[in-house]
Amino acid sequence: MAKLVYGLSQSLDGYVDHMKLGPPVPEAFHHFIELVRGLTGLIYGRRMYEIMRYWDEDLPDWDAEDRDFAVAWRSQPKWVVSRSLKSVGPNATLVADDFEKVIRRLKAELDGEILVGGTVLAQSLAEAGLIDEYRLYLRPVVLGGGTP
């Protein structure tokens, strides 16, 4: 049975605006590369998936670690929970209806860890009792506002 893990990066004052947090420090980024390499898959809400689609690109200014993360991310199966998206990118499956049922099935059929990305989706999954573990990553910044 797979374990559903919600990982959340937040500022020291408790906000989760990923665009304002900026990139992680190199040590943390290396951790995330290894984390993604070891996953069974990723489940995203629409907004977080749209942010993470960045890694489907191949940008000339990327360094070796950026490329390593992109390769790891692209290799993992992804499930995207959205009623508004009509399609998703490579190695991704759109989940438009009855996402709780789909996620319960994934947990039952797969082994390892499935990472959840997106605050709105995580709240729904938590209310349904589907998240098995929470991981909080504190970023050494104070944002002063945003999504708590």
Task: State where each predicted segment sits.
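Enzymes that bind and transform nitrogen-containing heteroaromatic metabolites
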Residues: 1-148
